[in-house]
Regions:
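Core catalytic lobe of class I
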Residues: 48-253, 257-260
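Amphipathic alpha-helical oligomerization/scaffolding segments
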Residues: 1-51, 282-284
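Asp-based, Mg2+/Mn2+-dependent phosphohydrolase catalytic module
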Residues: 215, 252, 273-284
Length: 284
């Protein structure tokens, strides 16, 4: 709290500290239970699908050709921490990649992704605009057939910019999608714009968190219910919750050294209300 710039920021930091502690206690209590109902067994499976650890260390245990889709939201190598700090957004626990290491990092991730995909499958990869050539080239080098026009998340908000006098406020993020084999889209004819508000700040647990509702839409654009998804960099874990909403099985990894994000994820699973996980309804 001593690092807070003002009283308002100190209150936000204290709130986050308190919430993190409560989520950690909730996660520990749930995972310690011995007798589980069927619904609780499903929750336990979802909790266990979030593995804490380095993707590069753990992916070797994933068998070949077992996944229908892989959703990759890697570090962007754009000094996100510096950008978010300038915008007073806390990025504690976020790990970035040095620009000089990024091409090799990408190719290693894509090589493993190609291995664990079935003979026909999709990879979805989010990226920073300045890395478009490198991301596309790395996907193609390992064998993927890449659609050269990205998909776009369009946020109907005011947007963000650090230099309003010279730069327009950004309201879009983008992903490349590529296929292995002869896989086809499930929502054929759908356009490449996904119009969704960001996850509400009051419930957001990760600096790059994407709304569950949007991830559900994206997943069902590419694969049918019942498929399996791997998420190399889980963050908030919302992709796994979106997958569960549409009857998909999923698993993934995150470094998350202090279990902050995994505890928040487990807390969401344990305290699920209604038939589906959601980002937006949590605020109502």
């Amino acid at each position: 709290l001593a690092q807070a710039k003002n009283a308002s920021e100190a209150k936000r930091m204290l709130y986050k500290i308190t919430r993190n502690a409560e989520e950690a206690r909730s996660a520990e209590a749930f995972e310690a239970e011995e007798s589980l109902s069927n619904a609780e067994s499903v929750k336990r499976r979802l909790c266990n699908s979030y593995a804490r650890g380095d993707f590069f260390d753990l992916v070797s245990d994933v068998p070949d050709a077992g996944c229908n889709v892989i959703e990759i939201d890697p570090p962007y190598a754009i000094n996100l921490q510096g950008i978010k700090e300038a915008e007073s957004i806390i990025t504690e626990g976020y790990t970035d990649i040095a620009p000089e290491d990024y091409p090799l990092f990408l190719e290693t991730v894509f090589t493993e992704s190609y291995r664990v995909l079935m003979s026909s499958g999709w990879v979805i990869c989010w990226f920073g605009f300045q890395w478009y050539p490198e991301v596309r080239a790395a996907l193609e080098r390992v064998g993927f057939s890449v659609c050269h026009i990205p998909g776009f998340w369009v946020k109907p908000t005011q947007g963000q910019t650090r230099s309003p006098e010279t730069r327009l406020a950004g309201v879009v993020e983008c992903f490349l999608y590529a296929r292995k084999g002869k896989e086809v889209l499930r929502k054929q004819g759908r356009n490449n714009l996904f119009l969704y508000h960001p996850a509400p700040p009051s419930t957001k647990v990760h600096p790059t968190e994407r709304p569950i509702e949007m991830m559900e839409d994206i997943l069902t654009t590419f694969v049918v219910p019942g498929g399996q998804i791997m998420v190399p960099f889980l963050g908030s874990g919302n992709t796994l919750l979106a997958a569960a909403n549409v009857g998909m099985r999923g698993f993934g990894f995150d470094l998350d050294a202090d279990d902050k994000y995994r505890n928040a994820y487990v807390n969401r699973v344990v305290n699920k209300k209604g038939d589906k996980f959601t980002s937006y309804a949590e605020t109502t």
